[in-house]
Curated annotation (Swiss-Prot):
Orotate binds at residues 121, 149. It comes from the Archaea. It comes from Pyrococcus furiosus (strain ATCC 43587 / DSM 3638 / JCM 8422 / Vc1). SUPFAM superfamilies: PRTase-like (SSF53271). This is Orotate phosphoribosyltransferase. InterPro entries: OPRT, Or_phspho_trans_dom, PRibTrfase_dom, PRTase-like. Transmembrane segments: none annotated. GO terms for molecular function: magnesium ion binding; orotate phosphoribosyltransferase activity.
Length: 182
């Protein structure tokens, strides 16, 4: 199934070449546009199945599924449906109106949360979400990402005491596409 995901990423032309500024602030000669993939229902179902199966293989227990806005929300939603677990959405910042929440969905002390992300570079975005969830009382039992760019996210996430589970590493995408990652 991993090979099918790689094929879909390539078929949807999710790898863009040029000059890009990433969320991390880093400059890059390529961009992984996973949003093209996560708007495809077939791809979303596959991603949710892959995460569910990997979590089961690893013995990861979780009560809820969370994702930081925006890119991870469709992934978290698909996984919540696949696993029949409640969904949490972590906002980048607290709402300035209405309830003023930063987390949509109910978090209780001790909730075991599986956190998902679309792409990781340095891990900053998903670590911010993990911190917000922990402050609300959640225990992060695993962090899953569709594509890890292999630029330090794994190390940064592990340094904070979490484990990253990438479905695909960027070098695997480049190998399948027949291009150099340099």
């Amino acid at each position: 199934m991993k090979e099918e995901l790689i094929r879909m990423i390539l078929e949807e032309e999710c790898i863009k070449f040029g000059h890009f500024i990433l969320t991390s602030g880093k400059e890059s000669s390529y961009y992984i546009d996973i949003k093209k993939l996560i708007t495809n229902p077939k791809a979303l179902r596959l991603i949710a199945r892959l995460i569910k199966e990997k979590a089961e293989e690893e013995g990861i227990q979780f009560d809820k599924v969370a994702g930081p806005e925006l890119g991870a929300v469709p992934i978290a939603t698909a996984l919540a449906l696949e696993t029949d677990r409640p969904l949490l959405i972590v906002r980048k910042k607290k709402k300035e109106h209405g309830t003023g929440r930063q987390i949509e969905g109910e978090v209780k002390e001790g909730d075991r949360v599986l956190l998902v992300e679309d792409v990781t570079t340095t891990g900053g975005s998903v670590l911010r979400a993990a911190k917000i969830l922990k402050e609300a009382g959640a225990e992060i039992t695993g962090i899953f990402v569709v594509v890890d760019r292999e630029e330090g996210a794994k190390e940064a996430i592990e340094k904070e005491g979490f484990k990253l589970y990438p479905l695909v590493l960027v070098h695997e995408l480049f190998e399948a596409a027949g291009v150099s990652s340099e």
